[in-house]
Amino acid sequence: MHLTSREQEKLMLFLAGELAAKRKARGVKLNYPEAIAYIASHLQEAARDGMSVAEVMQYGATLLTVDDVMEGIAEMVHEVQIEATFPDGTKLVTVHNPIR
């Protein structure tokens, strides 16, 4: 199987997001890279599932709370930006202050 650089990047993001989801499910507080991966991978899947850009942005702000991450992480994550594949093409999605 041959994957483009973009496809490899999406696959790595998915894998990191899965690892973060497993840790979160076990009650482990997420660090910075895990929190970003968790949010970004969920945004990618929401876009692929057919949500609109606005719906994906709103959804992204509901994924993690301050209690889900290590101390100080919520203040470090000002925004998460991804290029997501929607049914009508690729679009930039930005979620401001995603950890609330």
UniProtKB/Swiss-Prot annotation:
Pfam families linked to this entry: Urease_gamma
Cellular component terms (Gene Ontology): cytoplasm
Reactions performed catalytically: urea + 2 H2O + H(+) = hydrogencarbonate + 2 NH4(+)
GO molecular function, one term: nickel cation binding
Gene3D superfamilies: Urease, gamma-like subunit
EC number per UniProt: 3.5.1.5
Pathway noted in the entry: Nitrogen metabolism; urea degradation; CO(2) and NH(3) from urea (urease route): step 1/1
Keyword Hydrolase in record: yes
GO process annotations (BP): urea catabolic process
Protein localization: Cytoplasm
CDD domains tied to this protein: Urease_gamma
Keywords: Cytoplasm, Hydrolase
Coiled coil stretches, renumbered: none
InterPro entries: Urease_gamma, Urease_gamma/gamma-beta_su, Urease_gamma_sf, Urease_subunit
Matching HAMAP family: Urease_gamma
Similarity field: Belongs to the urease gamma subunit family.
Assembly: Heterotrimer of UreA (gamma), UreB (beta) and UreC (alpha) subunits. Three heterotrimers associate to form the active enzyme.
PANTHER family in the cross-refs: UREASE
Matches recorded under NCBIfam families: PRK13241.1, urease_gam
Designated name of the protein: Urease subunit gamma
Source organism of the structure: Actinobacillus pleuropneumoniae serotype 5b (strain L20)
Gene name of the encoded protein: ureA
